[in-house]
C-alpha cells in the first residue's frame, strides 16, 4: 500500500467558499516524483524528435493539473544529449522542444516578479539545441503572456533558431483569455 505510513502523504482539510456557501474540502498530498537525475536519458530516437526540457509549471492556474507538479528543468546539456540521439539514431534534422510552458523555463516563480521569462536561460537552452546541428526547432507549448512579457525575448530567440520565412516557428497556446476578470480569478500569474 503506497499510502501507508509515508512521510510524504497527508490529507489537508481546507475551508473555501463557493456560491456564498462554506465548503470543507479534503485535499490529498502525495509527493512521489523522481529526482531529475533519476529520469533516464533516451537511448533510442523519440517520436518526431521531441525532447522534454522541463516538467511542471509555476503559473498556478486554477483549472490546470500541470500546476500541481513541481517545476523542474532539464539542463541544456541533457537536452542536447537527447537531441543528438535523435540525430544519430533517428536521422532527425529538427527538434521539438516539449514543455508545458516554454517561457517558464529557467525561472524561479517564487522570486520572479510578474512571471517574466528568464531570457538568459532560454537563450542558453536554444543555443545548445541549435549547436547540435538541427535545422529547425520548435517549442510545443507556451503562453501568450510569456511571449510578450519581455520585448527582446522573441527577437533574440528568433535569431538563435534562424526563424524566418523559410523556417517558420510557432507555439501552441493553451487556455488564454482577454478577460481581466477571468485572468484574475483563474490564472493570476499569467
Regions found by a protein language model. Name each.
Residues 1-78:
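Acidic, low-complexity intrinsically disordered segments
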Residues 84-190:
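Conserved SAM/AdoMet-binding glycine-rich loop
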Amino acid at each position: 500500500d503506497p499510502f501507508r505510513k509515508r512521510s510524504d502523504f497527508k490529507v489537508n482539510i481546507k475551508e473555501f467558499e463557493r456560491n456564498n456557501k462554506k465548503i470543507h474540502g479534503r485535499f490529498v498530498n502525495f509527493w512521489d516524483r523522481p529526482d531529475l537525475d533519476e529520469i533516464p536519458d533516451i537511448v533510442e530516437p523519440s517520436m518526431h524528435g521531441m525532447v522534454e526540457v522541463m516538467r511542471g509549471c509555476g503559473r498556478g492556474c486554477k483549472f490546470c493539473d500541470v500546476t500541481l507538479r513541481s517545476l523542474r528543468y532539464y539542463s541544456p546539456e541533457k537536452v542536447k544529449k537527447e537531441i543528438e540521439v535523435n540525430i544519430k539514431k533517428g536521422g532527425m534534422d529538427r527538434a521539438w522542444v516539449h514543455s508545458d510552458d516554454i517561457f517558464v523555463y529557467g525561472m524561479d516563480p517564487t522570486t520572479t516578479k510578474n512571471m517574466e521569462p528568464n531570457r538568459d536561460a532560454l537563450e542558453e537552452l536554444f543555443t545548445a539545441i541549435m549547436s547540435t546541428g538541427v535545422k529547425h526547432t520548435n517549442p510545443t507549448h507556451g503562453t501568450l503572456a510569456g511571449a510578450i512579457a519581455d520585448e527582446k525575448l522573441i527577437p533574440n530567440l528568433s535569431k538563435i533558431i534562424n526563424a524566418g520565412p523559410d523556417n517558420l516557428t510557432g507555439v501552441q497556446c493553451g487556455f488564454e483569455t482577454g478577460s481581466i476578470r477571468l485572468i484574475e480569478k483563474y490564472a493570476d500569474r499569467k
